[in-house]
Regions:
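Conserved phosphotransfer microenvironments
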Residues: 15, 33-39, 48-75, 83-84, ...
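Receiver (REC) domain switch/output surface
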Residues: 90-91, 97-132, 243-267, 289, ...
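Active-site-flanking beta-strand signature of metal-NTP-handling nucleotidyl enzymes
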Residues: 145-146, 280, 302-313, 336
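Amphipathic HAMP/coiled-coil signal-transducing linker helices
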Residues: 263-283
């Protein structure tokens, strides 16, 4: 993979073992530096990624380095290997290495794909300063959705800690979780207490075997299993709910950012007809399509039905989640748009009123 720049490894002592693993994976050039020179190296070398070997004690330069990296465009991944202290908000933790860094290489490749996607979008937006400014102001965590699975005593506290940072969808069973994964845009999974190691192992195995979910951030809050799965963004994080949520956020934010970039690219390819946040039509495009559909139905006959899904305008997140679910579940012949009053309008082509009622009820049941 061409990473469009070197990989900088920051450490306070001798060269960390994972740097050699990067060499063996042919992710070069790999440049070693210490904390005193790290900021200058990032500024001068324009790296594709920065990996830090977390020191035993808190490193005062980490926060400043993280702020510098967060302001870098295009997206610059920052990965902290085996951290022992609290991390900045944009530092992705990588723990439980056990001397095997294959999963680190896979995680780095996944992060580099996000960087490449960001670079591609920036090229497409060249000459459109308004769209570029909107992208730069995007907060991926604001629209992120995490699937919290569990039924143990720590579930309520973990739900609150995650909910303070992003949207949360709860599931008390793995069966309910599977349904959410199939109908919602999920940016990460947190697997809490309440399941045996055998059940957890089966769930992780299924995720690893499904290409749709393989790159999802997955956080285990118990240490009963080793991270020996083909899941590059699998983390085992134990501790207080607030610490688990804080350490899970960077991985989830990265996935949400990747999804947002993909939607924006699709919108550009569609000539700006799609809303990059929801995947539905932009309002102007919807109005044009609706007028055309009505005219054709009046001229040639057939069925045409319209459904309005109302959401609380004081909670715009509900409309966003509902719109994304609808964009995933609608038939290809249907189209819709999110309206400014908090509702979502969907047009069912070639559909009579009775069938439209049945479809709308099914869609509503999923969005509850």
């Amino acid at each position: 993979m061409s990473q469009q720049g070197p990989i900088i490894v920051v450490s306070s002592a001798e060269r960390p073992p994972f740097a050699s693993a990067l060499d063996e994976a042919k992710l070069f050039p790999v440049i070693d530096t210490n904390w005193a020179d790290a900021s200058r190296a990032v500024a001068q070398l324009a790296p594709a990624a920065v990996l830090v070997a977390s020191p035993v004690a808190a490193e005062p330069g980490l926060d400043a380095l993280a702020r510098q990296i967060a302001a870098t465009i295009p997206y610059l991944p920052l990965i902290a290997v085996d951290p022992v202290t609290a991390l900045p908000a944009n530092a992705i933790p990588f723990t439980q290495t056990g001397g095997n860094f294959d999963r680190l290489v896979a995680r780095l490749r996944a992060a580099l794909r996000v960087r490449t996607l960001h670079s591609t979008l920036l090229r497409r937006l060249d000459g459109d300063p308004a769209a570029r400014a909107a992208l730069d102001d995007t907060d991926p965590a604001r629209d992120a959705t995490v699937l919290l699975i569990g039924r143990g005593a720590g579930y309520p506290s973990l739900s609150v800690a995650l909910g303070e940072r992003m949207g949360v969808v709860g599931a008390l069973s793995l069966e309910a979780a599977a349904k959410h994964l199939n109908v919602r845009d999920i940016d990460g999974i947190v697997l809490g207490e309440g399941f045996s190691p055998r059940v957890e192992d089966a769930f992780l195995t299924v995720l690893a075997e499904d290409a749709r979910f393989r790159n999802l951030p997955v956080v285990l809050t118990s240490g009963a299993l080793a991270p020996a799965y083909d899941l590059p963004n699998l983390e085992i994080l134990s501790g207080e709910p607030a610490a688990v949520a804080a350490n899970a956020l960077p991985l989830i934010r990265q996935h949400a950012f990747e999804t947002h970039l993909g939607r924006m690219l699709k919108s550009i390819e569609a000539g700006g007809l799609l809303d990059s946040r929801t995947g539905l039509l932009a309002p102007a495009a919807f109005n044009l399509d609706f007028v055309t559909a009505v005219s054709q139905t009046l001229a040639h006959g057939g069925g045409l039905s319209v459904a309005r899904f109302a959401f609380d305008p004081d909670h715009p997140r509900a409309q966003l989640d509902g719109a994304r679910i609808l964009s995933r579940l609608m038939r290809q012949i249907d189209f819709g748009a999110a309206e400014s009053d908090g509702s979502v309008i969907v047009v069912f082509a070639e559909t009579d009123l009775r069938t439209a009622h049945a479809i709308s009820r099914r869609l509503s049941s999923v969005m509850r």
